[in-house]
Amino acid sequence: KTGRNKKSSIKSIAEIFDPKNILSKHTDYYLQTILYAKMVWGNPNLNKEKLPVKPILFYVQNAKGAENDSDLLIDKTPVVVDDHFTDEFAEGIHKVVEDIFDESLPFSPTQDTKQCTNCPFYEYCY
């Protein structure tokens, strides 16, 4: 990441999928980073031995400092993607994708337009 270290602590995987946490806890960072880690962990071309993958957020501006705490924490425990990593994350992803493609759910933009400040698709919603 090249922006400011905005990482916040979360208590559960469910918080990642709660839209109200995107701005306050930057759960989008968790979503993206854990998703990448799961893809690396599950890809036999990248991880033949199925070694655990530890997703981190590395902030360039903090690279020299001793205080570069890059670990993603859920309930104060570092996230490690392996055989024992909970299926709750996969279920959350599945639910999001299912909702996107559910034709019975009409599209409605978020009521919290602060989330849209830098979105390149803003003009399609408002």
Predicted features along the sequence, with ranges:
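RecB-family 4Fe-4S metal-dependent nuclease core
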Residues: 1-126
